[in-house]
Regions:
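Terminal low-complexity/charged segments
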Residues: 1-164
Length: 164
């Protein structure tokens, strides 16, 4: 991993886009770039680990800021969103990856061995949405009691009626 610190250049987003699309043609689609931001969609959840390893090892994105789930019941899917930061080589540029996870197979590979910080984000996402991160070293609850049998961030989760 290159740890050279460089001053920001407005060509970095295009460079990152090009490297991702060249390496993963047909596996990733860069949907948007703007100053210090690159947005991309991973087309098949089976490719997420390989793409994340490349982003970490070859593009030097060394920190995962956020990993979260989003529920899209009308589309019969959830999404996992990865927000990844680079402090050195592409200093200050954030890469946001999104990947669809269909309701009928809520499994995706862990990236906690790529970025250690993903560990707790994946645990929280599993606990609140029910997305299973395969091969996670410790997929267990953080916030809710062990007796919970539902996932409170899913849109299908119903709050109790106010009976005041």
């Amino acid at each position: 991993m290159d740890t050279t610190i460089r001053e920001y250049q407005d060509s970095w987003e295009a460079e990152i886009k090009s490297k991702l699309e060249d390496k993963f043609s047909g596996k990733i689609e860069v949907t948007k770039t703007e100053t210090r931001r690159v947005y991309a969609k991973v087309l098949d959840k089976a490719d997420i680990k390989e793409i994340c390893k490349f982003v970490h090892d070859d593009l030097s994105f060394e920190h995962i800021n956020c990993l979260c789930g989003v529920d899209y019941p009308a589309e019969n899917k959830m999404q996992v969103i990865y927000e990844i930061d680079n402090y050195t080589f592409y200093r200050g540029v954030i890469l946001e990856l999104e990947v669809d996870v269909p309701y009928d197979d809520l499994h995706i590979e862990t990236v906690s061995d790529v970025w250690g910080g993903a560990n707790w984000h994946e645990r929280e996402t599993w606990e609140l949405f029910g997305i299973v991160f395969d091969h996670h070293p410790r997929l267990e609850r953080l916030l809710t009691p062990d007796t919970y049998e539902f996932f409170p961030m899913r849109k299908s989760y119903k709050l109790r009626e106010d009976k005041r």
